[in-house]
Amino acid sequence: MYSSVYLLLSIVFVGGSNAHDWDSFESHHSEPRLRTSNLDVGEYCATFHENYVYYCRGIWTAEKLLEHRSIMKKIGKFCPSYKSACVTRTRIDPEEERERKEDHKKELTDDVGDMAFDDLMRKLEKIVPCRPNCNVSVHPHCTRQCKCEYEYHRMQKWCKPPRIEERFKYFCRIWYMSCSTYIEELDPEMADAFVSQYANYGNYHG
């Protein structure tokens, strides 16, 4: 439910004690004016509550039907709109809502309990990507291998051309040594050069 309700009302609520003031307006004008208002949900519900009680919940006698026949189309639109915004929304039992949330949580945990470890890790990767700054003590799936896989395609744009540009060598060297699984993709001479210079650089993944 949005925090505000935007209403284009073809029925004007005339501030009085009687909800059927709608009809007093109808009797003096050939066409109803359009009133545009931007109301908070609570303001909308409070303002038009009397109209809802009178038109949507009151008993419709033959006399009442005859009296308001000219605005029946408007009433037909107003009643479900008000009910959706103000009545159905507020009838949620707090206890039922709590139980619903607990049941939903149980369904999620049951699903996780039935998953294999690798499947669970893959599911977690979709929720929290294995970026280099992902803390493995907080997110256990953020292992070095997971971080390497996450960065792999991006790093290949810079680190696997026929010749690596000088400005990228520092980062490529650190990445390949931190993600040694992929170092065999380099040609032997480049791999040897990276290994021989590794001691002078830090660890990409900390």
From Swiss-Prot:
Residue spans crossing the bilayer: none
GO BP: positive regulation of Notch signaling pathway
A cellular component annotation (GO) from this entry: extracellular space
Classification via InterPro entries: Notch_signaling_modulators
Highest taxon of the lineage: Eukaryota
One GO molecular-function entry: Notch binding
Protein name: Delta and osm-11 homolog protein 1
